Each structure stands twice: as C-alpha cells, then as structure tokens.
Amino acid sequence: MEEKLKKTKIIFVVGGPGSGKGTQCEKIVQKYGYTHLSTGDLLRAEVSSGSARGKMLSEIMEKGQLVPLETVLDMLRDAMVAKVDTSKGFLIDGYPREVQQGEEFERRIAQPTLLLYVDAGPETMTKRLLKRGETSGRVDDNEETIKKRLETYYKATEPVIAFYEKRGIVRKVNAEGSVDNVFSQVCTHLDALK
C-alpha cells in the first residue's frame, strides 16, 4: 500500500476562499478521474459518523481548537489507502495550510507530484464570496469576515507556495477568468503529467 501511494499522482490544490478551487476540483474529477479529498469534508464526515475519533474531533472543534495535525493526516491517509487501487490520483484540497503540514504529509504518506495554485486577486475573491453569500446563507460570507479570511489565507499560504516553488512543482493558474478559461489552464498542467 505504501508503495502504491508513493507512485500515485498527488496534487495539492491551494487557493483562497472564492478563488474557485472547489469548482476546478469538481471539473478535474470529471475529466481525469482523480479522487477529491478535502480535509474539511473528511473532518465533518468523521464527526457525523459518531465514531470514537469523531467524538474526539467534535469536542476539539466545539472548543474552537485546531484539530491535531496527526489526526488530519491519519484521516487523509485512510481515505487515500481506501481509494488507491481505483483512483487515477488524488486532489488534496486546501492542504497544506502551512509548511510543517506539507513536511509531515511527505513523511507519513508520500511526496506531492505538484501544487496547483488557483490564484485570484482579493477583489475578485471578495466579489465572488459576497455573491455566494446572497444565496448560500453562509454566515462567513460577509465583507468583514471575508477580509479576515483573506488575510489569514495570505499569511498562511505564502510560505507554503515559496517552499514548493523551491522544488519547482508549483503550477499557478490565473483564476480571474471564466470557469472554462481557468480549467483550460489547469488541463495544460495536468496533461503534462502523463
């Protein structure tokens, strides 16, 4: 299993809130048959499963604390091991959020093939999030909160991008255009992996 994970394509997908990375991940799954793993979704699924690990996570999250890195990695690893035989590769969405997370992932799972950086400017992301807020009812889609989320995102992500740029595996896509325009850039990078 270890060997299989080391040979499979693993793509970290990084982009700010409202950059459109979720949409791009869906399109990649449809076209390339990759498995889309979002740490947020994995955590939520574990909590609602009512497992022992889920109960522990629920308590941590209710206190507003960060879930331990080890737990997140165990969940990612379990999800990858479960799918490694049938998947063409993995999209790890919104991870790593800091350099240490990336290093731990490599130590415990495998090295990423590349980091796809879905890059939209702060004005674009804000506009998209406010638009989404009109229909989503998500409490975190208001201007004040969006500003804070973007600040947090930039502070956390810049060192991660720099870390992987040194290795030459960052592929940046300009996410200002239409969904299809952005996806054609994504395809160029993914097609080059074959």
From Swiss-Prot:
Binding site for AMP: T39, R44, Q65, L66, V67, G94, Y95, P96, R97, Q101, R138, R149
InterPro entries linked: Adenylat/UMP-CMP_kin, Adenylat_kinase_CS, AK1, AK1/5, P-loop_NTPase
PANTHER family the record matches: NUCLEOTIDE KINASE
Assigned EC number: 2.7.4.3, 2.7.4.4, 2.7.4.6
Keyword Phosphoprotein: yes
Gene Ontology cellular-component terms listed: cytoplasm; cytosol
Family affiliation: Belongs to the adenylate kinase family. AK1 subfamily.
Keywords: Acetylation, ATP-binding, Cytoplasm, Kinase, Nucleotide-binding, Phosphoprotein, Transferase
GO biological process, any: nucleoside triphosphate biosynthetic process
Subunit structure and binding partners: Monomer.
Domain notes: Consists of three domains, a large central CORE domain and two small peripheral domains, NMPbind and LID, which undergo movements during catalysis. The LID domain closes over the site of phosphoryl transfer upon ATP binding. Assembling and dissambling the active center during each catalytic cycle provides an effective means to prevent ATP hydrolysis.
Organism name: Bos taurus (Bovine)
HAMAP family: Adenylate_kinase_Adk, Adenylate_kinase_AK1
CDD domains noted in UniProt: ADK
Record's function text: Catalyzes the reversible transfer of the terminal phosphate group between ATP and AMP. Also displays broad nucleoside diphosphate kinase activity. Plays an important role in cellular energy homeostasis and in adenine nucleotide metabolism. Also catalyzes at a very low rate the synthesis of thiamine triphosphate (ThTP) from thiamine diphosphate (ThDP) and ADP.
Positions that bind ATP: G18, S19, G20, K21, G22, T23, R132, G177
Residue list for modification N-acetylmethionine: M1
The protein's name in its UniProt record: Adenylate kinase isoenzyme 1
